[in-house]
Amino acid sequence: MNIIDRFEQENISKRTANKKIPDFEAGDTVKVTVKIIDRSIEKDGKEKLTERFQAYEGVVIAKRNRGITSSFLVRKISHGEGVERRFMTYSPMVHSIDVVKYGVVRRAKLYYLRNRSGKSARIKERHIPIAKTKAAKA
């Protein structure tokens, strides 16, 4: 293992020490909670920073596993428009990742969903035995 790989592994272990990243793949519906920092200027001219959390729920259409720069692309329909957002898996701005539903797909990248709407864009749900999910949570 070279120096860069070792550095990346140390960095990943530091960032995942206090948060759990579940196993998910393309086709799964996830809920990503992101930390947003708002900057506002008060009347006396002082700058005020406020933190809040925003949830983003959608279908994972692509996943990129590249060490510390791993990311995944989530697509959702908001007010009739398709919205895609890429999240860095190990970013400190990503507060939590929760899997809502597991999907059954036969592709690693689901870019074809961009051209589909309605029933043709649905993904079958994969049912996981209860014992397996309880063991994963423990």
Curated annotation (Swiss-Prot):
UniProt keyword Ribosomal protein present: yes
Biological-process GO terms, alphabetical: translation
GO molecular function per UniProt: structural constituent of ribosome
PROSITE patterns: RIBOSOMAL_L19
Domain of life: Bacteria
Alphabetic keyword roster: Ribonucleoprotein, Ribosomal protein
GO CC list: cytosolic large ribosomal subunit
InterPro entries: Ribosomal_bL19, Ribosomal_bL19_CS, Ribosomal_bL19_sf, Translation_prot_SH3-like_sf
Purpose: This protein is located at the 30S-50S ribosomal subunit interface and may play a role in the structure and function of the aminoacyl-tRNA binding site.
Entries under PANTHER family matching the protein: LARGE RIBOSOMAL SUBUNIT PROTEIN BL19M, RIBOSOMAL PROTEIN L19
HAMAP family documented for this protein: Ribosomal_bL19 (MF_00402)
Sequence similarity: Belongs to the bacterial ribosomal protein bL19 family.
Name listed for the protein in its UniProt record: Large ribosomal subunit protein bL19
Organism listed in the record: Rickettsia conorii (strain ATCC VR-613 / Malish 7)
Gene name of the record: rplS
